[in-house]
Design a protein with these regions (language model features):
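A short-motif feature that recognizes glycine-rich, charge-decorated loops
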Residues: 1-311
């Protein structure tokens, strides 16, 4: 009798467990296996439109194998940024559908707050999607096609790769030379002229014609910096009044092996709170912004070049 009672109680408990799981399990509305966003053959994308409600609306176009920003400004784009974006796009997989309910758009930022991404191959639109927030694990982006209510999981952090303003897409290259081709550098600041000249394989520093000792390794670091100079950021509205009258603080020039000379002007920070150096090529109109660490090196500061044991 005791064994029979135990069996009845065990059966009742098992039934309760089955009922619990049957009533509490809440599966996703739709689920399917991972599928590539672009099935073979993949499109040759040559134009991209990004509509970002929180930042700039961007148009990127490929011209003769080189990518450019064509709106809201005309400027060469960062080739690496676009190549990485396209690589991520072409390897993106759709890992399942989260919801088909229109009211779920706001929850996943694929409604009015989402980023619209359109891609073209020639005259054909190959993708028109709204990208939303990323998953907690940072492995997926919530997305939906613009003409659909179906909210899906895209594997990868693709949404974060396109969420940037126009300056985030710009090519940050200022100069691109082989450091070995730099023959001399000169900085003119008021009545003081600081110069670095390559004598065979040794750099020589002079200040108003007077030679001073320098650390060769530090000097080569400066030469490498200027030869392959990339900006930290681009000048913005608050910087424009500073350079409006072209009243720069330092003029820096460098010569290369073929005899050409390249010159840029530097505006040093007006106070400690500014912490930014502004740079513009003498024949250019683009204003570059450098933070203190690198900007202070551009003016050929002797204190940064002298040997460590020099007082």
């Amino acid at each position: 009798m005791k064994n029979k009672s135990t069996m009845i109680m065990g059966g009742a408990l098992l039934l309760l467990v089955v009922i619990y799981f049957a009533t509490s399990y809440n599966p996703r509305e739709v689920s399917r296996g991972a599928e590539p966003l672009f099935a073979a053959p993949q499109p040759d994308i040559d134009r991209i439109e990004i509509v970002n409600p929180k930042k700039d609306d961007i148009t990127l176009e490929r011209r003769n194998s080189v990518w450019f920003i064509t709106s809201p400004v005309e400027y060469k784009a960062s080739q690496m940024s676009i190549e990485q974006m396209l690589s991520a796009l072409m390897t993106t997989t759709v890992d399942g559908t989260i919801s088909k309910r229109e009211e779920a758009r706001d929850k996943f930022d694929v409604g009015d707050t989402g980023i619209i991404f359109r891609a073209y191959a020639g005259d054909k639109k190959v993708l028109d999607a709204v990208l939303g927030k990323h998953s907690v694990e940072l492995t997926h982006t919530y997305a939906r096609l613009s003409d659909s209510n179906e909210i899906s999981l895209w594997r990868g952090i693709f949404g974060r790769q396109i969420d940037r303003d126009v300056n985030g897409w710009r090519d940050k290259t200022v100069y691109s030379f082989n450091p070995d081709d730099i023959m001399s550098l000169t900085a003119k600041e008021g009545s003081v002229t600081r110069a670095l000249t390559l004598n065979d394989t040794t750099w020589v520093y002079t200040e108003n014609g007077k030679e001073k000792p320098i650390d060769q390794e530090k000097t080569r670091g400066l030469v490498n910096l200027i030869a392959t100079l990339n900006t930290d950021a681009f000048g913005e509205g608050e910087d424009i009044p500073r350079v409006a009258n072209n009243d720069y603080d330092v003029e820096v020039s460098f010569s290369v092996r073929n005899g050409d000379t390249h010159t840029f002007h530097v505006w040093v920070p007006e106070d400690e709170g500014s912490k930014r150096y502004l740079v513009r090529k003498v024949d250019g109109d683009v204003l570059f912004r450098f933070f203190v660490y690198r900007g202070s090196q551009l003016v050929i500061d002797y204190e940064k070049l002298k040997p460590d044991d020099t007082a």
